[in-house]
Amino acid sequence: MNQNNINKVPLIIYIFSSIILVYIFHNSRSKTGIIIPQISQTGMKIINKKAYYIYFISFLIIGLLASNFYLKELNIKKKSTLTKILQFIGLVACFLNIVQGYYPLDTHKKIHEISAYGGIFLHLLVLSVWLYYNRRKDLITIISLSWLSILLMGPMRTINFNIGSLFQRLCVFFLLLALYMY
């Protein structure tokens, strides 16, 4: 499989696993007003093992394939030190993605949220710096939408939980779309 095809896999995995996890969420809990759960929310005090493994395996694969991108694709010409720093930060972000998958929101909220939002922030930071040196309008738009989604998530969650969760999902979707389009 060539590198361009590998870069497409995380978005496809994210879409399929999200659909499956939302389905499991709605079939495994009492009815509430939550239509769009947070990405990793199973809605149970006792973890649904099927949901847990789908989530963990999907973020394990996403983290590993994204780390492949940082190691093989991320480059800033004539800035080898900056490239190495960004690659390292990107790898840390990928590790945090794997940690977030291992520790579910329902049972390890603090660890999960620190690793999830820390990973998102580091990915956005690395890709924003990379785009500063490698202007690509399509990717600038996508990363800007990801930044906007994560910045609006908090205020939107106070208005309506479903809208906040939608913005959280959009942020990750746009990050993976950028990798897909790379």
Model-derived features: positions:
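N-terminal topogenic module of multi-pass integral membrane proteins
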Residues: 1-76
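Membrane-interface helix-boundary motifs at transmembrane edges
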Residues: 2-6, 71-84, 132-140, 161-162
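Aromatic-anchored segments of alpha-helical transmembrane domains
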Residues: 22, 92-99, 147-157
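Terminal transmembrane helical module of multi-pass membrane proteins
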Residues: 131-182
